[in-house]
């Protein structure tokens, strides 16, 4: 069954998520990403409609800061993207990435079809197995807390937040590579 081409990921502050995927993931897989933007999505389909950045940052809306993108070839790149997603943020912290705290900084994989959900769950289990075996020990705790759930409504963030680190190379980013390549099984 074919995978959906749309992908929405929460990995803490969306500026770093955008930079690591749009720039760094595409270094590994040139031309793999198109139509990327940062914004907000809530796991709750009944969450506040069209929240502002300030409202999301208050932690009261239930929205997660996300990168929303389209893959040119989801069959070839979705699984690699999910692995890459786990390489540059800490999926073992709940509602936090570094100094950024609050539910808006959750580690979250929003899925658009059953195949995406299966792949995301399998890769997440692989990561947990590597952590449990001690193959990977670059995270704060030993339990993956990333949530996987159905995508809901995406709200694009204000224009000045789009491509932020490309325009402000010295801007705030707490993401970094915790490991450089996915361990062998």
Feature roles, as predicted:
Residues 1-185:
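Flexible coil/turn and secondary-structure edge motifs
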């Amino acid at each position: 069954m074919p995978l959906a081409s749309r992908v929405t990921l929460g990995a803490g502050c969306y500026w770093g998520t955008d930079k690591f995927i749009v720039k760094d993931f595409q270094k590994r897989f040139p031309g793999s990403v198109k139509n990327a933007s940062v914004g907000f999505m809530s796991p709750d389909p009944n969450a506040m409609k069209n929240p502002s950045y300030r409202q999301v940052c208050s932690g009261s809306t239930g929205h997660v800061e996300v990168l929303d993108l389209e893959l040119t070839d989801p069959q070839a790149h979705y699984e690699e993207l999910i692995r890459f997603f786990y390489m540059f943020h800490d999926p073992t912290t709940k509602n936090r990435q570094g100094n950024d705290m609050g539910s808006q900084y959750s580690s979250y994989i929003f899925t658009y079809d059953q195949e995406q959900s299966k792949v995301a769950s399998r890769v997440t289990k692989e990561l947990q197995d590597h952590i449990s075996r001690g193959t990977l020990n670059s995270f704060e705790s030993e339990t993956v807390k990333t949530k996987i759930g159905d995508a809901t409504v995406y709200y694009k963030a204000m224009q000045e937040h789009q491509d932020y680190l490309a325009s402000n190379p010295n801007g705030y980013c707490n993401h970094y590579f915790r490991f450089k390549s996915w361990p062998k099984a």
